[in-house]
Amino acid sequence: MKILKILSINLIALMLTNSCVETKKSLEVEVVETSRSGNKLSKVEVFSEGKPTSKINLNPDKTFQTFTGFGGSFTESSAYLLNRLSKENRQKIIDAYFAESGARYSLTRTHMNSSDFSLGQYSYAPVEGDTLLANFSIEEDKDDIIPMIKEAMNASKEGFKIISSPWTAPPWMKDNNEWVGGKLKPEHYDTWALFFSKYVDAYKAEGIDIWGFTVENEPHGNGNNWESMHYTPEEMTDFVSNYLGPQLEKDGKGDKIIL
């Protein structure tokens, strides 16, 4: 039975409405705050106009770096909540982010294994000592995350890229045998690299392409009680150069981006 973590979230919703007066357009902004402490869609003080401090000149003919995309994250908790809505309302939300009539998200992120936005702690490799990952399974994602991604894919006309990030390796691969903190044991670097490759294959079997990875979420640690694992820059360089990169190349996944 999955246990939903109750997160204390202060949500500020900005509701923007346009009003037109003849040929001059103005923008009206209303700020509403909701929090667990008691505010229930409470209006807060409106913005006051300040004096301009900067002047921005836009020149579309002069370009520099290319943006890969804009977007947000697919998480187990958000997918779980989305699944509790009616089919009609769920589709409205998906369309608001991914459809042509919506924000048209083009770059997204999801988590490998559980994260602080999961309903509980889990790993795709739960069996201790399974260094060949014979028991690897993404079954946990099939209830929530994967259906949400597929609905987004159906709504998106141009498609979007997915970056996947682990918060932690399974505890049995770590020097502290815990979900929180600790480091990946050097003797499990090769197993952890194989984990990434198997993850790509498992999602591919579900019809979902993984575009790239970040090696670790918050590799310097976050000091909190949710899933984490730590790397020094030297350790991460070693892992990517000598284990993850070669494993992906060997398995025909050399086109995957490592960020």
Task: Enumerate the language-model features and the residues they cover.
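Boundary/junction segments of secreted and surface-exposed precursor proteins
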Residues: 27-32
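Short secondary-structure boundary/hinge segments and terminal tails
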Residues: 21-22, 118, 221
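Bacterial Sec-dependent N-terminal signal peptides
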Residues: 1-26
